[in-house]
Amino acid sequence: MLFQTLKSIGELYKEPMDMVQRRLDSLSKPLGSLGRLEDIIKKLAGITGEVFPCVDKKAVIIMCADNGVVEEGISSCPKDVTSKVTRNFLKGITAINAFAKHTGSDIVVVDIGVDDDMDCEGIVKRKVRKGTWNIAKGPAMTRKEAIEAIEVGISIVEELGRKGVNLLGTGEMGIGNTTTSSAVSTVLTDSKAENMVGRGAGLSDEALKRKISIVKKAIDLNRPDANDPIDVVSKVGGFDIAGLAGCFIGAAACRIPILIDGFISATAALAAVRMEPKVKNFIFPSHGSAEPGSKKVMEALGFEPILNLEMRVGEGTGAALAFHIFDCAVSVYRNMGTFEDACIEQYQPQV
């Protein structure tokens, strides 16, 4: 399934993008004055093939999984917070619930690897295993499990596409996943661990040093192949990262625009793009995470964040916030009058 899906990914549709540009230039405003909003509309048209794209049915996919590396003391939170917060998503009391409600978005909570029996009503049960192994002692998962987790993400997106979802956000929950994301991104960007590892949920200076040493140890021990993103994710990643990588791949194949959230989902996006570079055409950034590795990953992807609010909540909150920007971009493009409507002579570009 994975490799067939990768092969099916196409290019952006050029003709609708050209038609959108002509309409943008006809609107009663200085040429290009809507800035990046114009880029958003053109890319939406290129993805969907629609000259008047819609983003009225939104969803945030939250991949939830535990990470064995937590036993190394790299997190300020106990392991059981993963299952507790996952349940809280379904109770409607988390940050992403508040943001999603405000933007009229659904949230899709996926148990892809929580180390608990998640028999909650409303959860999508796609558990690969109850948590990964400790990357400081060996690989996080087998290659087969990594592919299985990626395919979970692909299938979730396909299901949402069949339901008419036309804008996706990505989120995650998993204690220890800033450590695994740091390890994966360190390898994929050929960086030093010191430049990629952050404080996560609020580590002390001493705990931060330990976290850096654990990331270095995991990479030295497992020797992931930077040219094989599946190998990297399987050796030093997590089920949430693999699942989110699958979401980006699935969105590209289904031609559904999809937003990165923060550091973890950006790392997953980078892994997906390394599997198939055309995946990038279907991805949008949302916000600049406060995690130090996030900037490096976004640079590797060639993206500039739309928002910079120094957030590091995760859960898909940055993506949900950026949904507002997409709503505004679509609204101004659809509803603004043309020069003809305004009885104003059209601007001509100055050469």
From Swiss-Prot:
Name of the top EC class for this enzyme: transferase
Protein name: Nicotinate-nucleotide--dimethylbenzimidazole phosphoribosyltransferase
Annotated source species: Acetivibrio thermocellus (strain ATCC 27405 / DSM 1237 / JCM 9322 / NBRC 103400 / NCIMB 10682 / NRRL B-4536 / VPI 7372)
A GO biological process held by the record: cobalamin biosynthetic process
Reactions listed under catalytic activity: 5,6-dimethylbenzimidazole + nicotinate beta-D-ribonucleotide = alpha-ribazole 5'-phosphate + nicotinate + H(+)
Pfam families found in the cross-reference section: DBI_PRT (PF02277)
Keyword vocabulary terms for this entry: Cobalamin biosynthesis, Glycosyltransferase, Transferase
Pathway: Nucleoside biosynthesis; alpha-ribazole biosynthesis; alpha-ribazole from 5,6-dimethylbenzimidazole: step 1/2
Active-site feature positions: E315 (proton acceptor)
EC code(s) of this entry: 2.4.2.21
Family to which this protein belongs: Belongs to the CobT family.
Function: Catalyzes the synthesis of alpha-ribazole-5'-phosphate from nicotinate mononucleotide (NAMN) and 5,6-dimethylbenzimidazole (DMB).
Domain of life of the organism encoding this protein: Bacteria
GO molecular function annotations of the record: nicotinate-nucleotide-dimethylbenzimidazole phosphoribosyltransferase activity
The keyword Glycosyltransferase is assigned to this record: yes
UniProt cross-references to HAMAP family, sorted A to Z: CobT (MF_00230)
CDD domains registered for this protein in UniProt: DMB-PRT_CobT (cd02439)
Record lineage: Bacteria, Bacillati, Bacillota, Clostridia, Eubacteriales
